[in-house]
Amino acid sequence: MAATRIAILYGSETGTAQDFANILSHQLRRFHYKHTVCSIGEYSAQNILACQYLFVICSTTGQGALPQNARQSPQGKVEGTLWSVLKRSSLPPTLLDHLQVAFLGLGDSSYSKFNFAIRKLHNRIVGQLGAREIFPRLEADAIGLAGSNAGNGNGIELVYSEFEKRVLSFLNDQFPFMTVNGEQVPREPIATDIYLKPEYYLEASGNDKGTASVPCTFEGDSSVKYGTVVTNKRITATDHFQDVRQLVFSSQDGENYYPGDTVSIYPYNTDADVQAFIDTQQHWASIADVPLQIKTPTSARGICDGGLVSPLTLRNLLKYHCDIVSIPMRSFFMKTWTFAVDHERLPDGKDQLQQQRDKLREFAESEDMQDIYDYCNRPRRSILEVVQDFMSLRLPWEYILDYLPHIKPRFFSISSQPCNKDIELTIAIVRYKTILRRIRRGLCTNYISDLSEGSIIRYKVQYNDLLPAGKQDRPVIMISPGVGLAPMKCLIYAQLFNPMLLFFGNRYKDKDFLYADTLQKWADENRIKLFVCFSRSPDDSPGLKYVQDAVWENAREVARLITEENAVVYVCGSSGKMPVQVRLTLCEVLKKWGNFPDDKASEEYLKDMENSDRYLQETW
């Protein structure tokens, strides 16, 4: 990757930071700025010495860590990546004094280490290596309680919009002119109704051999492995609203995984959804199964996470790489509204065509995100449904890898015994009704629910280094409602802590008490101390509705283990109210039974526990 003086770097776990980086790149291209856009892990450490203007967009994962694609190269290597180089203690404090930089953090303040990743980057790049800040760091909060959008009702999209405005204002002030044919002319943006062709695109390969019966393989990512499904069993009652699966698959060579490590699964779309998408684009029918090739100035190896499908056809790309059932982000509308040109399929012809163009353009360009939120996010409307609604869209198949988002692997905590050849995951199947009264099923959990014994899955093990060094052989207090039990189960198998207290909660004892027999057996064998509560069957846990109630009932023992025996606290489960309520409860426990005089003192103690890796939280 050649060095440029402007670079946009992202660290993204779920794809949001990457999407914002791509939107910013799109805007810079409109203003004729040559630049690089890529993950932090992909960016050459050498190139930062030639870079003059750097824009960083990064989310936070795990215990305040940078996302994987910020820490590792696309090939899974850590050594030699930008972040690994920047962390070297031998670097001089003036290394980056040539660099001007701006930061945008994406976080969730229900996590204690809110936006830690962007703060780490900021502290190292600006505070310790001498880069100059263009404008103060912006931090977006997904729940709107902290950071740059604290209490103002604005979502992360509007924080990004402010970031984009400041970036463009700065660059356009710095470079009001550009060179065209050797002359200096005012810098004017390319009109938004002109599609900016991407660096890579598809074209027919000229090989007209049939592909329908050719089995698919994936090229370009040797770190992806194949597993064979051993068990895919529902472990909640059939009349319970939540379908939770115990998915077990065997690895080819065994895996050296440990408590807290995760597996990333590579799902794909159903054949029915792929065909439905092709049906919305009638001009694709004749090309859908024709062999294609990617035209790119560099290499196509890193274009799709997990390796590129072969045979490379439009149908296979839609099935394995394009996330057509995801909720569209603004970048989708920015790149596609100009293709609303087909009035022949509209009942009201050209009049309706103009209406559709106007609405799509509004989604693409309006700073008020309420309309796009109401149309896409509230009803969880998918890209497939959008193109079915807007039949005027005549999308060019050559650019689908540019305007359609790519399928990302989904991460699940390992719940089986460490270093076992058979890997067990505990997965809640996503299925719900929207305000449109339509059934929604998550892409990955839909894929998982259809797996049967003998099915082959593609996966990677992600090593998260969750367990704090030197913190073992001491008590651990595990707090985990629902499928948050998964990593706790792996931790109990490992027997690294003693004693082990498990506070587990769910709705009903007879419907969703996950792994009840196993947990009770461990409790009978004194491997764990088990405390359970069931929010919808109070007779089975009198006086205890939620996990924090069970913690409070055992407050004296919890406080003693934390303050006298330096216990580790591990909270895992759904984000939102649970981790907040658990933390508040622990503050009260410490204040009453840990001899802390007030809320401030107990909260400071919890913060010290976080900083020393004794308070661990993994929520989603």
Curated annotation (Swiss-Prot):
Catalytic activity: 2 oxidized [2Fe-2S]-[protein] + NADPH = 2 reduced [2Fe-2S]-[protein] + NADP(+) + H(+)
UniProt entry tagged with the keyword Cytoplasm: yes
Gene Ontology CC annotations of this record: cytosol; cytosolic [4Fe-4S] assembly targeting complex; mitochondrion
Biological processes annotated in GO: cellular response to oxidative stress; iron-sulfur cluster assembly; nitric oxide biosynthetic process; positive regulation of nitric oxide biosynthetic process
Principal place of residence: cytoplasm
Places the protein is found: Cytoplasm; Mitochondrion
MF terms in GO: flavin adenine dinucleotide binding; FMN binding; NADP binding; NADPH-hemoprotein reductase activity; oxidoreductase activity
Superkingdom, natural source: Eukaryota
Keywords, in A-Z order: Cytoplasm, FAD, Flavoprotein, FMN, Mitochondrion, NADP, Oxidoreductase
Annotated function: NADPH-dependent reductase which is a central component of the cytosolic iron-sulfur (Fe-S) protein assembly (CIA) machinery. Transfers electrons from NADPH via its FAD and FMN prosthetic groups to the [2Fe-2S] cluster of DRE2, another key component of the CIA machinery. In turn, this reduced cluster provides electrons for assembly of cytosolic iron-sulfur cluster proteins. Positively controls H(2)O(2)-induced cell death.
PANTHER family, sorted: NADPH-DEPENDENT DIFLAVIN OXIDOREDUCTASE 1 (PTHR19384:SF10), NITRIC OXIDE SYNTHASE-RELATED (PTHR19384)
Protein name (database record): NADPH-dependent diflavin oxidoreductase 1
Species, as recorded: Eremothecium gossypii (strain ATCC 10895 / CBS 109.51 / FGSC 9923 / NRRL Y-1056) (Yeast)
Gene: TAH18
